[in-house]
Amino acid sequence: MSRNLYALVVAATAIGLAASACSGSPNSATKATPSATATQLQSLIPTPANTQRTDGPDSIPDNGIHLHFLVNGSSTDVLDAYKTALEGKGWMVTVVSSGRWAGAGGATYTGTQGDTYGVFSGGGSASAADVSACAWPSKPSNPNCGGGNRR
């Protein structure tokens, strides 16, 4: 191969590599993933066993949703079972706080599932528990999910 032809092949290869690096790829790691819809978020939130009433989903800031469940059963048992149900739905769960007293108690969990972020909290008596569940397409700057003004 002549020196000029070799230089031309090297230049063409370099241009081809540069062009392919600049073109979009359907498998690009930097490709933006679409935000989850409220319906998709709701499908990620399990309904606790023995739920007697469900409120929501309600829209909350940062494209999130909030659900409230009133559940029959000891609040400590309800929240322990709910953590297991979240993990069964694919959530990576972190216990933020938990406490028990005379059959009553409460807990707050955070969770991630891919980019989706959730806050799950609840508490109550020895016979009933309130559970609030919130999910967002990605972690919001203020992941407020319960009590007070969520809007």
Q: What is each of the regions a protein language model found here?
A:
Residues 2-8, 15-18, 23-151:
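An acidic-aromatic pocket/loop used at catalytic or ligand-binding sites
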